[in-house]
Amino acid sequence: MSEHPLPASVAATLEQGLASMGLDAALAPPLLRYLALLHRWNGTYNLTAIRDPQEMVTRHLLDSLAMQPFVADGSLADLGTGPGLPGIPLAIACPGLQVTLVESNGKKARFMREAVRQLGLGNARVAESRAEALDEAGRYDQLTARAMDTLAGIVRVGGHLLRPGGVLLAMKGVYPHEEIAELPAGWQVREVTPLSVPGLAGERHLVTVTGP
């Protein structure tokens, strides 16, 4: 599928957001290519409930990139990534990061494979699988999950993927007091960091969790 042209205002919103977050303006062109592809495919395959490109910039791209300063080079598994969020924006922004995009939905996996191909992302691959069925135990330095389950639920289905000393980076809305209290034995919260996302009024927190 060819790219779908986006209004100039969408590019301006993204560029302003990147600037306010202190991120490189050179990230804008590949991010816009990804967004254009997502917008086009979404019309047919219903990959995300958000359909307005302006809203996609804020709630998908900038929200995903808010965690970028806390992501280290190495390997990262993005669990239940949907159409590639936050994994594809992170792969674009972090060339030293090897991202595995874990998603069991076939339509979303096909979209991501096409996006990875069109963007030439040599540091991203798609694993069409449920997280709990992925046979890659202890392989990842970092796990992330932006819209998947509670902290305990993420650990239950994906904790086996994390190497000793690795970290789970979980995107949450309001401070997740109850979820933290329900973490399994041996899993500890290292830090809860408030995040600021340009154009997003709601609370966002990044919860950093270490394994046993």
Curated annotation (Swiss-Prot):
Catalysed reaction, written as an equation: guanosine(527) in 16S rRNA + S-adenosyl-L-methionine = N(7)-methylguanosine(527) in 16S rRNA + S-adenosyl-L-homocysteine
GO CC annotation: cytosol
GO molecular function ontology, one term from the record: rRNA (guanine-N7-)-methyltransferase activity
Domain of life: Bacteria
Family the entry assigns: Belongs to the methyltransferase superfamily. RNA methyltransferase RsmG family.
Function: Specifically methylates the N7 position of guanine in position 527 of 16S rRNA.
Protein name per its UniProtKB record: Ribosomal RNA small subunit methyltransferase G
Organism the protein comes from: Stenotrophomonas maltophilia (strain K279a)
Gene it is expressed from: rsmG
